[in-house]
């Protein structure tokens, strides 16, 4: 048993080295004391840290740079997005740094504001335990915030983006295609790629939210010109996009197909449904014995027979969960409908 624990620690040591409670890390000449682990996923850990000098609290994301320079570039690109995107609804970072540790492993540290209220996912879990619903007014405000974040990404002015797009700048896919609309009104379109309640952080008043986790962001449209590219896109989507929120066009990518920002709109619909009913629309089908992938690809879901929500919210979900991407509304169209309802 002792050897088993030793082997486990040896395996995890590259991820947790120097980041135990009360340990201190130095980022760009500022010292921060680790308070506790807030969350983890993939190659990243998020810690609550306290500035040693002024005692302010922050969130620190530690990203493991696997696969050499490729991993470093991916993590640094994520940090760059957090630093340069100019929207109140996208999480901004304070600073970041590439760090090489004693064992030779490399990490990117990103320092963020600390959101003590946690994520929308935590609110959903609490409501599920209590058997209660989130108010429609609160949901509409959250959706408005998310639509503003998505509109910024999907209709991004090239001057606001971290840099002009290049062939190898995409994060989600290894062999990306240059977006075809970059010369059209100087717009650059990004897809977030992993919209879900866990990635929506609550402000102190719990009213507004910000979108986080930019590790899946990439430029769109992405065209799969052959089977090899189609498989690569599909594989990367399976790595980056959480399955219950993943758009059907990412499950079975075919040569000649194009991935657009409408994949985010599908995820928006899944997220809204989850906020309303505490489970994603397709997980409910699986709980009744179905296949998740099949349910998603067939857009097979249903609403509970009894619930407190208006027809409008259900119609928004239905509009977003169209199998054909071009039939889904844009973030701008969703925002217009949602804000109209809020202001009534």
From Swiss-Prot:
Presence of the UniProt keyword Ubl conjugation in the record: no
Key words of the record: ATP-binding, Endoplasmic reticulum, Golgi apparatus, Kinase, Nucleotide-binding, Serine/threonine-protein kinase, Transferase
Transmembrane annotation, as ranges: none
UniProt xrefs under SMART domains: S_TKc (SM00220)
Gene Ontology cellular component terms for the protein in this record: cytoplasm; endoplasmic reticulum; Golgi apparatus; vacuole
Gene Ontology BP terms: regulation of vacuole fusion, non-autophagic; signaling; vacuolar protein processing
Substrates-to-products reaction catalysed: L-seryl-[protein] + ATP = O-phospho-L-seryl-[protein] + ADP + H(+); L-threonyl-[protein] + ATP = O-phospho-L-threonyl-[protein] + ADP + H(+)
Subcellular location: Endoplasmic reticulum; Golgi apparatus
Documented EC number(s): 2.7.11.1
Binding-site residues, ATP: 38-46, 61
GO MF terms held by the record: ATP binding; protein serine kinase activity; protein serine/threonine kinase activity
Stored Gene3D superfamilies: Phosphorylase Kinase, domain 1 (3.30.200.20), Transferase(Phosphotransferase) domain 1 (1.10.510.10)
Active site: 192 (proton acceptor)
Any Pfam family matching the protein: Pkinase
Domain of life (superkingdom): Eukaryota
UniProt protein name: Serine/threonine-protein kinase ppk13
